[in-house]
Every structure is written in C-alpha cells, then in structure tokens.
C-alpha cells in the first residue's frame, strides 16, 4: 500500500453507500482529508463525476443480450404420474417448479432459526377444527365456542408455543372462533355429516399412461339435499371466484371432482352443490352457479395439461404468463427469472 501510495498519481476511493445504507468514513480517511486541507489541497475538486463514470464502466458490458429462459425437457418416464391439487396450480402457473421439485427433487432447506409464520398459525387452526369436527360430525353443540377455545389452549400447550407468540396469536384465535361459530350456526342446519382433513384422488388415461390427481380437503360436507359441499379454510388470502372460474385456483374444483367421482373414502359419488372458501375471521366466498360446467372445464384443463406434458418436446418453462406467475417460488433463482425477464432495452 505504501509503495502504491508513493506513485505519481494515485486515486483513493471509498463506498459512500452499501446496499443503500450510508457508510461512515474511517478515522484514517478523515485524518487524510484534514492533512490535505491543511496543505491547501482542493478536496472538493477531486469529487468529480468522471470517477463515478469509471466505476460504472467496471461492470458495464459492451453488448446487452437478453438471455433465454430455461426450457428443460426431461424424458417422459422421469415426469411425475401423480400430482397433488396444490401442485397442479404451480403446474399451470409455473411448470419449472414441477421440474425442480418433482423431477430434480430439490427442496429448500429450512432456516436454522426459523420464526413462526402465518402458515404455522394456519396449522393450529386446521388441527383444532379437525379435532372439533371429528367430535361433532353431525351436530353443532351449544357450547361450541368454549370447546373450540379449550382445544386451542390444549394445542398451544402441547406444542409448547412460546408465550410471546401466544400473546400475539391468541386474540386472533379468539376472533376466528367468534366468526366461525357464527358462520356454523347459519350453515350447519344444511349439513348431514362433516368429514375433516379427508384424502382422495381420481385417475384418467393420458398418452403415457395412467395419471392420478390427489388432494387433502380441509372439509367435505354431506348436505341434507343429498349433495356435497367442499370447504377450504383460509387464514390469509382467499381466492376469488374469477380465479377459480378462470382455472388459476384449481384446488377446490379438483376436490369437487374427487367428490363427484367418488374418490373420497366412505363418501359415495355425489353431485357437488357448492365450493366454499372460509376466510376465517373475515368472510365467506361461495361458488355454486353452473357447478357442473365449472367442474367439467376443470377436468378438461387437467387432462389437457397432462396430455401436453406427456410429450418429451414439451418443456417445463418458467412463468409462461408473468401476470399469472405464483406469488412466491422457492425455485425462481434456479430459473434465473431476473436475468431473462429483463427486456432488451433494460440493463
């Protein structure tokens, strides 16, 4: 450093910001400025735009070329023959997720010190409601609120939920229970029997052979009019009717198809009456118009999707329609989305 500093012309530079955060000058740097000022040097004149231009040129490419998105085409025998309802949505919105997760079998590692999230709160709600509905599949007791709150206390205690987390979540849980009890009082008279956290599937023939769609429904209700209602609990964002009808939220229609085909254990093939989102603590979204047409279109989309991907020339491209891309993906960096999604006129 001393030898370099003794050269005829020396440029000393420092970062004023790192990732947007202002950086404090080092004591040595401030001492150097003081000495230069004492010698009468024009420090202000050294801070010229030319230096910034030189810095920009370090990472500047002579030619900007838009990179193509990945287009993996694994052999058909390596492609999945069983798909869950939640995976079907990713299949529609971002096929690359299916390639990375189910063909390459890559899985994101958990954080070493992972905080509890809204997903964990949702797990609590599902566990409490499953236990309650299994106790009361054909009735709704007068003391339902007290029983649900007691089940919640038991879950928090058994799973050793930290007191600070409990203090934050418990008021929300109480609010959810209040909303749920009100909704159930209006809804349960229509229900003959409730089935909670029930698994099911249906299969069809695709070009490369049998293909199976699976799902685990939060709730499937046999109603007094001889039909089936399917309910999906949501502690966060609930899907809109438009998303469901457009095919971009296929989970409930898939569960409806399983019910229609008799794919849930101990529930005979039955006409589907309603698909329902319960955004717990907030609102209810009911889909019941043109139900047979909705389910038929959903079935056609799934069969078409499986048929298209049964040909090796079909690539698992990433985000074919950016406007319908998933809100979050563990594999976006592997697909290099930020590289190829930049337009040719951007740097």
Name these PLM-found stretches.
Residues 1-42, 234-236, 241-243:
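Conserved C-terminal motor-coupling region of P-loop helicases
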Residues 16-19, 27, 34-52, 146, ...:
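Metal-dependent nuclease catalytic regions and adjoining charged, substrate-binding loops involved
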Residues 30-131, 194, 322-323, 327-336, ...:
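C-terminal, charged and often intrinsically disordered regions of DNA end-processing helicases
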Residues 195-263:
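Non-catalytic protein-protein interaction segments used by genome-maintenance enzymes to assemble
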Residues 95-106, 148-153, 221-234, 274-279, ...:
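Active-site-adjacent bridging/hinge elements
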Residues 80, 88-96, 113-124, 144, ...:
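Secondary-structure capping and boundary motifs in well-ordered enzyme cores
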Residues 12-13, 73, 77-86, 105-115, ...:
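Glycine- and acidic
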Residues 124-205, 289:
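A non-catalytic, helix-rich entry segment at domain boundaries
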């Amino acid at each position: 450093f001393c030898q370099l500093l003794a050269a005829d012309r020396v440029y000393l530079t420092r970062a004023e910001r790192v990732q947007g955060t202002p950086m404090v000058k080092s004591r040595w740097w401030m001492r150097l400025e003081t000495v230069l000022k004492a010698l009468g040097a024009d420090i202000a004149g050294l801070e010229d735009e030319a230096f910034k231009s030189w810095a920009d040129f370090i990472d500047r490419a002579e030619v900007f070329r838009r990179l193509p998105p990945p287009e993996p085409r694994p052999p058909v025998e390596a492609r999945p023959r069983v798909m869950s309802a939640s995976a079907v949505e990713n299949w529609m919105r971002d096929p690359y997720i299916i390639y990375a997760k189910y063909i390459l079998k890559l899985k994101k590692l958990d954080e070493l010190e992972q905080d509890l999230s809204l997903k964990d709160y949702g797990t609590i709600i599902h566990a409490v409601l499953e236990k309650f509905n299994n106790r009361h599949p054909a009735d709704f007791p007068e003391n339902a609120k007290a029983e649900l709150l007691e089940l919640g206390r038991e879950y928090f205690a058994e799973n050793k939920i930290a007191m600070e987390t409990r203090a934050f979540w418990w008021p929300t849980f109480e609010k959810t229970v209040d909303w749920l009890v009100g909704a159930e009082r209006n809804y349960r008279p229509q229900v003959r029997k409730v089935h909670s956290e029930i698994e099911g599937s249906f299969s069809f023939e695709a070009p490369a052979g049998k293909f199976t769609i699976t799902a685990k429904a939060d709730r499937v209700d046999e109603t007094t009019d001889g039909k089936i209602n399917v309910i999906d609990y949501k502690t966060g964002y609930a899907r809109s009717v438009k998303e469901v009808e457009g095919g971009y939220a296929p989970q409930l229609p898939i569960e409806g198809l399983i019910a229609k085909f008799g794919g849930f254990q101990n529930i005979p093939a039955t006409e589907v009456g309603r698909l329902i989102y319960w955004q717990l603590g907030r609102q209810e979204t009911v889909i019941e118009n043109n139900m047979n047409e909705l389910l038929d279109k959903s079935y056609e989309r799934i069969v078409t999707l499986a048929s298209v991907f049964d040909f090796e020339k079909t690539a698992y491209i990433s985000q074919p329609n950016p406007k319908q891309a998933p809100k979050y993906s563990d594999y976006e960096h592997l697909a290099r989305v930020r590289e190829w999604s930049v337009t040719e006129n951007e740097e």
